[in-house]
Amino acid sequence: MPIKVGSKAPDFALKSKSAAGLADVKLSDNLGKRNTVLLFFPAAFTSVCTEEMCDITAGLGQYAGLNAAVIGISVDTPFAQEAWAKQNKIGLTLASDLNKTVTKAYDVLFPNLAGVGDTSARAAFVIDKHGVVQYAEQTVTPKDLPNFAAVKATLSKLK
């Protein structure tokens, strides 16, 4: 089970790769400024994850209007994430949890997915600008998408 609503969200520093190079992505960078949506996903270059991140990219303006930053987190390398983002025109920040420390901190590890090893489960968290989890969902299977209507409804209450 993922960490619970009302819990203090674990801070993190993960790597993200873009044309500008490697950069740190930290939850604490948003604290006091805006809410954060964390979207854990199993793997780049897979059909459901691509669909999810492309849909989120198309709706980034809505999330910005709800005073929220969106960060996608997987256990892929930042270089694989960058190549996948370029190939699919994914516009949100992707952060590499290669060592699975953040995935474990949020308790969303999916053990031995399809026989290829441990990955992040598909999960969504809304964290308010004070660092408190306001929404937490882990999908039953990696094929299922989070309830994005509930994510947006939570954000609209926090604006």
Where would I find each of the regions flagged by the language model?
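Chalcogenol-based redox active-site neighborhoods
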Residues: 1-159
